[in-house]
């Protein structure tokens, strides 16, 4: 029985006119070998759990031609740090084709680090071990946290030298995503006045990903409304979990509201609203607390690109739904994190007082919520001890517990502290991919030891579980590991 006999492939994007892409032959790395294969994800596509068959490596690395694949580099544009750049496209990654999972959903197969393309500009078309490991681990960590994201099927390392600030090992990532269509795809066709192609792109987005929009009187408007809602939801999830993307250019924004293009990202350690994780972000444009604003800016840029298809008034009305949607979803997530069942007057003030307290005391964001989730097992003092200003912490905690008691009294189904805390532990992770943990795995991997990569990958699949034997990974970061800023070079 063939390795591929049960796998369903397609090449829908390759059926579009040639102006949408360029066909490119992958340039395999030297002595490619697996670092990690995501067996659980692979099984969902009828692929084997273990990557023992050498054909898996040769096909997914691009070393062996495969009839189901038609490798191509997409053309797009985008606003980078607010400045329009028309000269973008897949500069080091290739869309190989699509696979269908067992739920009937199609996923793009994208090989990142596949070599030069017509859109490589001054680059070499390669990805390095360091950044590839970070993307693999973070995309899978985000999926386990329940946040919309691209996925990682596997990654490889090679003997090919890649020249960045220093010589590094070349690597490749097999990224799966429901689409690789970005805001920047629409911007490219708009700014080059290729309006027929703009319409064709919108038609295919609707057909492939949002077929329900066809029943709408204004299907293009319905499509944009979905993009707005999905983006608002994604940003609310980022802010709730403490995730900073680092480089929210419009070419890094998925039209399906999925976290996309992991680069200089970071999870909050101490709660610092203005946290900047990208060392190239000198102005703090993409700081943690700016992400909601930037996403709206990006949606406005997309709206401008869609103006040949959608009336201006309709675009403005759709954009006006972004902030209410973001606020509603974020408040729901905060109530879940605090174990509150219902919405009550004064909740916003409670949240704002909490954020102010966390910021003033430089309290670890993830540990605070996880400790609050342990109040059925621990004394209140364990929460208060997280803060420098213990009196202020005691005051907020008393207010919070009054809010919990008031809800239980007012509601018909009062929950016990144990029930409430169990529900809180299911939404407040114990383990996140702190930058220092990723760096420790990278340091070992660069010496040829991938054990820490596998340890982290296993740990982060179940971020809400106690995993007592892994307790050290929940510790606060050492001083050198706090507020790490990451390079965009990958």
From Swiss-Prot:
InterPro entries: SelO (IPR003846)
Cofactor(s) the protein needs: Mg(2+); Mn(2+)
Residues that bind Mg(2+): 252, 261
UniProt cross-references to Pfam families, sorted A to Z: SelO
Active-site annotation: 251 (proton acceptor)
EC identifiers of the protein: 2.7.7.-, 2.7.7.108
The UniProt record lists the keyword Metal-binding: yes
Alphabetically ordered keywords of this record: ATP-binding, Magnesium, Manganese, Metal-binding, Nucleotide-binding, Nucleotidyltransferase, Transferase
EC supergroup of this enzyme: transferase
Residues that bind ATP: 89, 91-92, 112, 124-125, 175, 182, 261
Free-text function comment from the UniProt entry: Nucleotidyltransferase involved in the post-translational modification of proteins. It can catalyze the addition of adenosine monophosphate (AMP) or uridine monophosphate (UMP) to a protein, resulting in modifications known as AMPylation and UMPylation.
Family: Belongs to the SELO family.
Protein name: Protein nucleotidyltransferase YdiU
Organism ancestry: Bacteria, Pseudomonadati, Pseudomonadota, Gammaproteobacteria, Vibrionales
